[in-house]
Amino acid sequence: MEKEEQLFRKRIQELAENAYSRDIPLHTDFLTLAEQTVFQNMSATLPPVKFVLSGGFPMSERKVLCFLASYEEELYAPPFVCLKIVPANRRFAEELTHRDYLGAIMNLGIERAMIGDIVLQDGNAWAFVMEKMSRYLAENLTMIRHTSVVTGITADFSELPEPEMEEISGTVSSVRLDSVIALCGRLSRTRAASYIEDEKVSVNGAVCTNVSLNLRGGEILSIRGIGKFRFGEPGNLKKKGRTSVVVYRYK
């Protein structure tokens, strides 16, 4: 186990113990997919305190882990907000990317862990950030590259677009990683195994070289040079022992 993971586990353990013993709500900053996986793997060893993993919308990847106080379980309020960022003048607006928005926010001195998902559509952006940073960003995030923008805090998530995805369905001999990667990339199983062994495949943000890893459903899979996918829930068992599955490719 790497030192970074050991420190993360220790921090989560301390948060859970404090939340449970003092009956107070405590939370992390935004966690990566890999950190969320570490937490899920250790959750059974933590004190019996209720928790919420939330990133602001169902398809979010970066999420905040909140340990709840007993009195707060029905009144949970996330410690983050959503910023809506729009061009001040669309006529002169550039075509901006996720990297442009993230870079502009971090150039204001905001650490990556303070920033959740950033969703783009039609020249607008929605960025989830920790609440303690929101007022500063609303006042100071006025330029993305060479485009003047207006930044405000919004509670209206109805406009928030869902990621565009291509549905890929098929059957696999098992829900092992190599079988699912073969379906995602339209590869032979042997070729898929080579991608995995060559460290070209990530599962929930962490490089995975275990070709026989069994997937549960909901994992984010990245294949270098091919794309990013979300694995759906395994379906029914078909003829000849094959399992029907659906994966979604991010466009």
Residue ranges and their predicted role:
Residues M1-D178, C184, V207, N214, ...:
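Ferredoxin-like alpha/beta domains used as RNA- or RNAP-binding modules
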Residues S174-G225:
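Basic (Lys/Arg-enriched) interaction patch that binds polyanionic ligands
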